[in-house]
Amino acid sequence: MANIRSTTPPPRNEPVLSYAPGTAERTTLISELKRQAATEEKIPLVIGTNKVMNTKAEHAVVSPHKHAHRLATYSAASADEVQAAIQSNLEARKEWAALNWEDRAAVFLKAAELLAGKYRPIINAATMLGQSKTSHQAEIDATCELIDFFRFNVHFAERIYSEQPQSAPGMWNRSEARGLEGFVYAVCPFNFTSIAVNLPTAPALMGCSVLWKPAPTSLLSAWVGMQVLEEAGLPPGVINLVVGDPAVISSVALAHPDLAGIHFTGSTGVFNMLWKTVGQNIDRYKTYPRLVGETGGKDFIFAHPSAGVEELVTGLIRGAFEFQGQKCSAASRAYIPKSLWPAVKEGLVQTAEQIKVGDPTDFSNFMGAVIDQKAFNKIKGYIDDAKQSKDARIIFGGDCDASVGYFIQPTIIEALDPHYRSMKEEIFGPVLTVYVYDDAKIDEALTLCDTSSPYALTGAIFAKDRRVIAQLTRALEHSAGNFYINDKPTGAVVGQQPFGGGRASGTNDKAGSIWNLLRWCSHRTIKETFHPITDFRYPYMQS
């Protein structure tokens, strides 16, 4: 398509299906859930054209809500296999980067259509079974958000390529957005299928090749994502999938001289480790690696005395307990004025009592299980501490049971000390801690909200008075990269609320935005002169 100036289809957010009783999508999804539950998938490493299974290094993928149930078996990559995957990336990069950008874009637009069609129940079922998401949480993540990433990233890439410098008479200036020279290392979390697939595909769209390391606990849905990309026409080697011991994979990737970037979502501690290692290895790299990370959060809801109780309670419940609080944006701490607390407390307890926890294939459940035993133990540790502490009291929940699945009841803690650990530390589970502040000391409460935690990912305020809304927004300016007014702090939509935070929450490069894509290209400025100068002398030199 050398003789065409194309325009990509206008992006649109994928409509969310309801899965209400009697709908066609519910019937299809139930059938697919049964099919996948009865099948143990074999998930290989994907290295170029090779699908590699190593029976000596096999590991199981289990269902969090039924951990005796093996969903899949995967091969853990050796150091040699990681090296081979990187070499395959480097070999594929030149041809991939040389394609017209429209040809690269077409792969991801095709992938979006596949997800909207036949792969919708497949990737949703894999996300429900493998990550214990309800049908709604799987739909808004694995299908809708991932489709949105593909469509909007293409739109933003078109804007990048279209942005060109001015040209003076007698010359033509151009700007070329080249893919990074080398390979990008994509390190993925368990909690969002869409993020796990966007981390490698956003750089790939811009002409990069990518070493993709999904989390083993979300590997079933990541494998579906890989199959979608292959069917959409992604050439072998552009994205290679490796999984296994993170230390083995990262040690090879971070020591490689062709490391061009890291696209990361996960814990602050792991990202800090990656950053430090890159710093220690800086002299061996051919270029300065781009480091893009979305990390931890201790996300807040701050209520003013003018807030409406009903919407505040709903925001707290949904913000804290959807997907078991395992969203990096989940409401984990709240500051409630004393004047509202009796009504808010009553509403929280009454609403939490209605929440059903269990197998997400039972569509009446609001919550599933937390992801694994390690997460269960960590969250339970915070709950046990609150049960014994003089600085906190549990006002709802606190029950934990890992006998069948890793189930934790939604838990609400009232902190008597605003510096109590569950008001400051990331828990990543269905635990909401509330501090009740004196209405007359709202400025002190705002300072606590801003300074108590090192994170600054998401936050929300609830108030009716417009002057107060402006005041709170200013006071909490740097407390959150995504800030919500009279809404829960979760549920960012691609193309509407670009997502990311600062401080210890990451580099704030906003996934699903033009700013993120700019990190995966290196611009070359080209100046062509139509009237070359033939005399080295300047006019001022004339006698």
Please describe what each predicted stretch is.
Residues 79-90, 94-95, 105-121, 132-161:
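Long amphipathic alpha-helix in the N-terminal Rossmann-like dinucleotide-binding domain
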Residues 1-71:
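Hydrophobic face of amphipathic alpha-helices that form TPR/SEL1-like repeat modules
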Residues 128, 147, 157-311, 504, ...:
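Rossmann-like NAD(P) dinucleotide-binding subdomain of oxidoreductase/dehydrogenase enzymes
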